[in-house]
Amino acid sequence: ESRGLGDVYKRQGDGRVNRGVQEVLKYTNIKKITPEDFLDKKFDYPVFCNLDTKDYVIHNENKKFELEHFINYPREYQSKTFEYLKESDIYISAHYWDPSSPKIFTKNQITNFTKLKIIGDVTCDVDGSVPSTIKSTTIEHPNFCINKDTFKETSEIENALAVMAVDNLPSELPRDSSREFGNGIVNEVIPFILGIDDGRILNATITEDGRFLDKYSYLKDYIDSK
C-alpha cells in the first residue's frame, strides 16, 4: 500500500520551484490528491499532495487563518504538518521560508515519522525549516543519511533518513532556467534599476556597503560559521 509516495509542500503562493516539483511528479504518473484525501483515504498506488500555507500552519490560539496576518506575524503560528509526515514515504520541500516562521517539524518529532525514508529539501536552508538539512550537498554528491535518533550523518541504513539538499538545484535545468531567468531580468528587474524602484530592488538586495541589510541579517551567522 502506498498512501503517500510524494508529499510536496510550498510556502506562500504558487512558486516556480514548487510548480517545477509538481511538473516532475506529473511526468512520473504519481497522482495528485487533496490534503484531506491524503490523510483520510488509503490508496493502492503512489500519490502526493501539495500543501498551501493554510494547510500546514495554524495560529497558536487557533484563530481563523489569514495569509496576510501570517506573513506579518509568523511567530504567532506553528506547524501542523505532523499528521502528513506520519503518512509520508517521501517529503519534498519546495517553499520559501522566513526564519521567523515555524519549522516544518522538530528534531523531537522525527522519530514518529516511521514511514518517512527520503527528504528532498529543494529549499535547502541549513538548520532552517527542515531540521534534517544539517548541511548542503552538491550535484556530484547530492545526498547523505542521518540517524533519526542522533541527527548525525551516518553510513548505516537502519533508522536512517536519506536527505537530498543541493543548494543550487533549481539551476540544474540550464535551458529552462536561463530562459526564465533572462526574461525575468529583462522585464522585471532592469526597468526598475534604470527607473523608479517600486520596492522590488530594495527587497531583493542582500548586502549594501559590505553589510547585510536587516532583512537578511540572519545569514551572517551562517557566513561566520564557514
Positions of the model-derived regions?
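Glycine-rich Rossmann-fold phosphate-binding loop(s) that bind the pyrophosphate
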Residues: 13-14
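N-terminal Rossmann-fold NAD(P) dinucleotide-binding loop
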Residues: 18
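Rossmann-like adenosine-cofactor binding region
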Residues: 43, 47-153
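Single conserved hydrophobic/aromatic residue that forms the stacking wall/gate
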Residues: 1-5, 9
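Catalytic core of tubulin tyrosine ligase-like
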Residues: 23
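Flexible, glycine/charged-enriched surface loops at secondary-structure junctions
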Residues: 6-7, 31-43, 194-205
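Adenosine-phosphate binding glycine-rich loop
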Residues: 3, 118, 123-226
